[in-house]
Amino acid sequence: MATVLAKIKIMPTSPEVNKEKLKEKIKEVLEKQDVAIRGLFDEPLAFGLYAIYTVIEMEEREGGTEPIENALAEIDEVESVETVEVSLA
């Protein structure tokens, strides 16, 4: 199987969500998903809103990133999760 890199966009529920605490929760979830975290950063959008992006490395698997997206979406402070890019490592 091939190794893939995936960039995932995570939107918090509001601008008041503590970014650093949310990043820690994201790391905890990803560590349980058998993936390597290659990047975790935030990007300001507008009016105090921001998106958090993570870049992960994983072995190609059935279902792709969907199980990871679902696990991240279960975090209380997360509004939405979307895989924005996937490529071979």
Curated annotation (Swiss-Prot):
Entry's transmembrane regions: none
Keywords, A to Z? Elongation factor, Protein biosynthesis
Q: SMART domains under this entry?
A: EF1_GNE
GO molecular function terms noted in the UniProt entry: translation elongation factor activity
State whether keyword Protease applies.
no
Provide the disulphide bond pattern.
none
Q: Where is the signal peptide?
A: none
**What's the domain of life for this entry?**
Archaea
The keyword Protein biosynthesis appears for this protein: yes
Membership in a protein family: Belongs to the EF-1-beta/EF-1-delta family.
Q: What does this protein do?
A: Promotes the exchange of GDP for GTP in EF-1-alpha/GDP, thus allowing the regeneration of EF-1-alpha/GTP that could then be used to form the ternary complex EF-1-alpha/GTP/AAtRNA.
NCBIfam families (alphabetical): aEF-1_beta, PRK00435.1
Q: What is this protein called?
A: Elongation factor 1-beta
Specify the taxonomic lineage: Archaea, Methanobacteriati, Methanobacteriota, Methanomada group, Methanococci
